[in-house]
Swiss-Prot record:
Protein name in the entry: Ribosomal RNA small subunit methyltransferase H
NCBIfam families reported in the protein's UniProt record: 16S rRNA (cytosine(1402)-N(4))-methyltransferase RsmH
Source organism: Brevibacillus brevis (strain 47 / JCM 6285 / NBRC 100599)
Taxonomy, superkingdom: Bacteria
Protein family: Belongs to the methyltransferase superfamily. RsmH family.
Length: 314
């Protein structure tokens, strides 16, 4: 993919950046640079005294950002890394804290649409799915080396696919004959594992399984949990974290972390004084998630599952 072909429609862009309550001289972190939509908007709101740190582990995204953010590079620092390292990144840059952190957990459209990366079930390509091309674990490794129980487990947990065991069985039976090399081969095996009646309704039959394998390859959920907790830790008082999720697993994690960090005293009401010592760390700004507008949904069908949650450091 060339830099110019990296075209990605950013979801909930205005709402997520508004949620950060940008101050022109503040320090902000975009943990998911992607197509640089959010980063471009944040950078445009900063003065020369402000700073944006934009993180991505995908070389394509970073190359694209160097062009898209060229006029703002006096206030932008690009970092190739996984966002789970946000605390170390902030520390290594000599910063004591930041004023806002943004996460957009959607996979960039170019990654989905370009078959060569192995993310898409609509194109035949080598099984890969690595966001970081230097990472050791690929989709090929999972599909051809993990045991049947492990494969079924991740498809169930990360894809919420009720036919996970049948799909895992098809995969293991086929790889006994020869290795499964491509996404096209995997799609056919997934279809064979799902009853015909179930294949005729709902989304593409491979959607949930591909999501599950991608999450496992990139350790997305554990990385996200670590990153949100650490993002809250590095926030300055009144700093905000904006999180856009695209499926229920991510949204539940975000909601639970916000709830846990917003809890104050947990002593029984009858206690005359607090003995637990618990203090709220954040206040939740969005009691209910912000959803895309009808106009955005009409323009971008991939926005339909997006949810935005915002919290503020106390």
């Amino acid at each position: 993919m060339t830099t110019l072909s990296f075209h990605h429609v950013t979801v909930l862009m205005d709402e997520a950046v508004q949620g950060l309550n940008i101050r022109p001289g503040g320090i902000y972190v975009d943990c998911t640079l992607g197509g640089a939509g959010h980063s471009s908007l944040i950078a445009s709101k900063l003065t020369e005294g402000g700073r944006l740190i934009a993180i991505d582990q995908d070389d394509w995204a970073l190359d694209n950002a160097r062009e898209r953010l060229a006029s703002y590079m006096d206030r932008v620092t690009l970092v190739k890394s996984n966002f789970r390292h946000i605390k170390d990144i902030v520390k290594d840059l000599g910063l004591s804290g930041v004023d806002g952190v943004l996460f957009d957990l959607g996979v960039s459209s170019p990654q989905l649409d370009e078959g060569e990366r192995g993310f898409s079930y609509n194109a035949d390509a080598p099984l890969d799915m690595r966001m970081d091309q230097q990472a050791p674990l690929s989709a090929y490794d999972i599909i051809n080396e993990w045991d049947e129980e492990e494969i079924a487990k991740i498809i169930w947990l990360y894809g919420e696919e009720k036919f996970s065991r049948r799909i895992a069985r098809q995969i293991v039976q086929q790889r006994k004959k020869q290795p499964i090399q491509t996404t096209g081969e995997l799609v056919e095996l997934i279809k064979e594992g799902i009853p015909a009646a179930a294949r005729r309704t709902g989304p593409h039959p491979a959607k949930r399984t591909f999501q599950a394998i991608r999450i496992a390859v990139n350790d997305e959920l554990d990385a996200f949990k670590e990153a949100v907790v650490d993002a809250i830790e590095v926030l300055n008082p009144e700093g905000r974290v904006s999180v856009i999720t695209f499926h229920s697993l991510e949204d539940r994690i975000c909601k639970q972390i916000y709830q846990d960090f917003s809890k104050g005293c947990t002593c029984p009401p009858a206690f005359p004084i607090c003995t637990c010592g618990n203090k709220a760390v954040v206040k939740v700004i969005t009691r209910k998630p912000i959803l895309p507008s009808e106009e955005e949904l009409e323009a971008n069908k991939r926005a339909r599952s997006a949810k935005l949650r915002v919290a503020e450091k106390l």
